[in-house]
Amino acid sequence: MKWLCSVGIAVSLALQPALADDLFGNHPLTPEARDAFVTELLKKMTVDEKIGQLRLISVGPDNPKEAIREMIKDGQVGAIFNTVTRQDIRAMQDQVMELSRLKIPLFFAYDVLHGQRTVFPISLGLASSFNLDAVKTVGRVSAYEAADDGLNMTWAPMVDVSRDPRWGRASEGFGEDTYLTSTMGKTMVEAMQGKSPADRYSVMTSVKHFAAYGAVEGGKEYNTVDMSPQRLFNDYMPPYKAGLDAGSGAVMVALNSLNGTPATSDSWLLKDVLRDQWGFKGITVSDHGAIKELIKHGTAADPEDAVRVALKSGINMSMSDEYYSKYLPGLIKSGKVTMAELDDAARHVLNVKYDMGLFNDPYSHLGPKESDPVDTNAESRLHRKEAREVARESLVLLKNRLETLPLKKSATIAVVGPLADSKRDVMGSWSAAGVADQSVTVLTGIKNAVGENGKVLYAKGANVTSDKGIIDFLNQYEEAVKVDPRSPQEMIDEAVQTAKQSDVVVAVVGEAQGMAHEASSRTDITIPQSQRDLIAALKATGKPLVLVLMNGRPLALVKEDQQADAILETWFAGTEGGNAIADVLFGDYNPSGKLPMSFPRSVGQIPVYYSHLNTGRPYNADKPNKYTSRYFDEANGALYPFGYGLSYTTFTVSDVKLSAPTMKRDGKVTASVQVTNTGKREGATVVQMYLQDVTASMSRPVKQLKGFEKITLKPGETQTVSFPIDIEALKFWNQQMKYDAEPGKFNVFIGTDSARVKKGEFELL
């Protein structure tokens, strides 16, 4: 595959602007060589040049290219983001080499979360694959395309554990579970960075948003987070540490406050934990405008105070504000910030530039100028095959009454819904340099699959929403949602007439991509009413009804679950989304995705997640009792639990077999089950292993995911799946904030989702 190509592209530095003889060369990419090099470089730098390295600016209206040129000339820029073509990146690096005194290279960054030009499923969809090979594919292709555009760093992966679907940025992460998020994040870092971020087709990652951003109160963007240290370190911190242990070179610091202190000014978080406890050596980057926001947080009196607090707390690079360059010179002069503190921040920035290989070749990710693509958006630059394969694995079959799916290609199919033919929405949030016109919609995918065999009819049926306030919000900066001027009833009538002419109705419904994005928190997580009215009208036709969901968060679907004959969760599936969805609808691919977040029955249940603590009065549905932990107007559990997902075949899981009834601290126990495909077609499923610490010094979750394996079985085939359990799987942060495992009984649960499991047990001695 072209994205795995390891052939280097020779870059003749003689073709580039003249370089400083003593700065660039064949420097060994070792910590020792780096430290010596950076120490000498710092000695040559002025205060202003050191401060300039701490400035990360975005290309845009506030910073036009002409203004950036002057900043570069004066050594006032350390890195650039939001520029994504080789031509633009080359021009800026040329300016550094031609105009600046020391010629310290820029690095270039972008939000490449689920693809650069080829857009893969959103991270929440990727998590649904429960397949680390799929994560590796996304990471390698994304890095290849980003590096091929000249980028050196991505603001990814996002590893914020989120248990509140009201939060719009849940779409960017890997879901509610600590273990799954840690595993996915670690794998993404390794895939994107490859052997070294200095490699031609690798990029440096930036784990974000540190810390606990996914736990904002009320699921409201930019809100505060308040939690015990035990919950913080047991549930929310492990994914960040996993990404850093995998070698991530950067951390983006969160916008929220944590237990009363904004993360941007939290020296305990950024120094005591990140540097001292975890040994992180890379750079910390503030989120967009976060330093100036310390004033509004109420922890800085004025801009100068905000800069002082941020730098002393451990923020190395300032994103998208001029505060460091404007106020640090005076703070240094007055002694409120020491030269040692400035040098420490600048050293971290220079270190990552060295690790990127920029002091060996500042054009390392650009290649020779003559290799620049004539058309930066050329079809030949896409990786459609990989995108389609990964997208298929991300799809989750939620319901399939009477085997409504797969559909017959010879049928007359009505494709209905405001998202059925939306090229933009299928790509989802943070679609990087992806081009909407290159994406495949569900309507197009179905037409491609049917060909001349059957007939495909189409009606839009409804607007995404009829709420003018929401439309205005979504279209605040551009026309992201196109509104059909027809009346709602006129559109529904057309859809009903289309449905009546068909054998089956496929309704593509859910959210526009802007509804599941940064700054897109919702209090109502149902499908918008305009679409619910459409679904009701389609149901009334009596035709088999298949709902294809397009969304970036779990939705409350109690009514739709009752109405639909089949429901396929597709998230935002990316460039090849339409073809991948059609593959599943027609049975060319057997769905195998599993939910990485629980789907609540209503917003009133939130947060609903599988790994909750027990109570002194737990609810038992088999033995109802008024005085137990429950709602009297709603069921306790999720509509669709974590790890849930159906297939076109069926599987059985045997009883759990333990290799031993007891385990020593330096030993291990292996838990095994036999999984059998009891259906009539080949299929894959995810075997999931959960643990429960039955009695401990503090209340522990009712179960926690500690292992998973995706297996493919032919009809009638049986496979033994085994999970080794060691002491690390049993440890937790206790009331004394000691990380350890406690002796006693442990339950082992193994199944194909978090609710349907077989149980075993062992004792830790």
Curated annotation (Swiss-Prot):
Family membership, please give it: Belongs to the glycosyl hydrolase 3 family.
Q: Which organism is it from?
A: Escherichia coli (strain K12)
Q: Where in the cell is it found?
A: Periplasm
**PROSITE patterns tied to this protein:** GLYCOSYL_HYDROL_F3
GO biological process, alphabetically ordered: glucan catabolic process
Instruction: Please state what the protein is called.
Output: Periplasmic beta-glucosidase
Taxonomy of the source species: Bacteria, Pseudomonadati, Pseudomonadota, Gammaproteobacteria, Enterobacterales
| Entry keyword set | Glycosidase, Hydrolase, Periplasm, Signal
State the signal peptide span.
1-20
The principal localisation class reads: periplasm
Q: Which PANTHER family match?
A: LYSOSOMAL BETA GLUCOSIDASE (PTHR30620:SF16), PERIPLASMIC BETA-GLUCOSIDASE-RELATED (PTHR30620)
Which top EC class is given? hydrolase
As recorded in UniProt, its EC number(s) are 3.2.1.21
Active site residues per record? 287
Catalytic activity from the UniProt record = Hydrolysis of terminal, non-reducing beta-D-glucosyl residues with release of beta-D-glucose
Pfam families per the record?
Answer: Fn3-like (PF14310), Glyco_hydro_3 (PF00933), Glyco_hydro_3_C (PF01915)
